[in-house]
Amino acid sequence: MFTMKKTLLVLFFLGVVSLSLCVEERDADEEDGGEVMEEEVKRGALRGCWTKSYPPKPCKGK
């Protein structure tokens, strides 16, 4: 029971730290003039390789 409480406490702490960092970053972005810079999101290297067919088809690289 003690290890479960300890684990939950660590997860709670990490969540609070993560939330705090997100708030700081958002505040910093607002101070820069409120502009949101769009960045191209690179998709995973295996995009298009995974199909619902079995056996899986080989991946054709880009």
Swiss-Prot record:
Pfam families listed in its UniProt record: Antimicrobial23 (PF16048), FSAP_sig_propep (PF03032)
Organism domain of life: Eukaryota
Signal peptide bounds: 1-22
The UniProt keywords, alphabetically, are:
Amidation, Amphibian defense peptide, Antibiotic, Antimicrobial, Cleavage on pair of basic residues, Cytolysis, Disulfide bond, Fungicide, Hemolysis, Secreted, Signal
Q: List the disulfide bonds.
A: C49-C59
Query: A GO biological process this protein is involved in?
Result: defense response to Gram-positive bacterium
Localization of this protein: Secreted
InterPro entries reported for this sequence: Frog_antimicrobial_propeptide, Frog_antimicrobial_Ranidae
> A GO CC term?
extracellular region
Q: Which residues carry this modification: Lysine amide?
A: K60
Transmembrane portions of the chain: none
Q: Which residues form the propeptide?
A: 23-43
Q: Using the record for this protein, list the coiled-coil segments as residue ranges, or answer none.
A: none
UniProt note on tissues of expression = Expressed by the skin granular glands.
* Recorded family membership: Belongs to the frog skin active peptide (FSAP) family. Brevinin subfamily.
Q: What does the function comment of this entry state?
A: Has antibacterial activity against Gram-positive bacteria B.megaterium Bm11, S.lentus and M.luteus, and Gram-negative bacteria E.coli D22, Y.pseudotuberculosis YP III and P.syringae pv tabaci, and antifungal activity against C.albicans ATCC 10231, C.tropicalis, C.guiller-mondii and P.nicotianae spores. Has weak hemolytic activity. The mature peptide inserts into the hydrophobic core of the bacterial cell membrane and increases permeability without disrupting membrane integrity. Probably binds to the outer membrane surface before aggregating to form transmembrane pores.
Q: In its UniProt entry, what is this protein called?
A: Ranacyclin-T
The record lists the lineage as: Eukaryota, Metazoa, Chordata, Craniata, Vertebrata
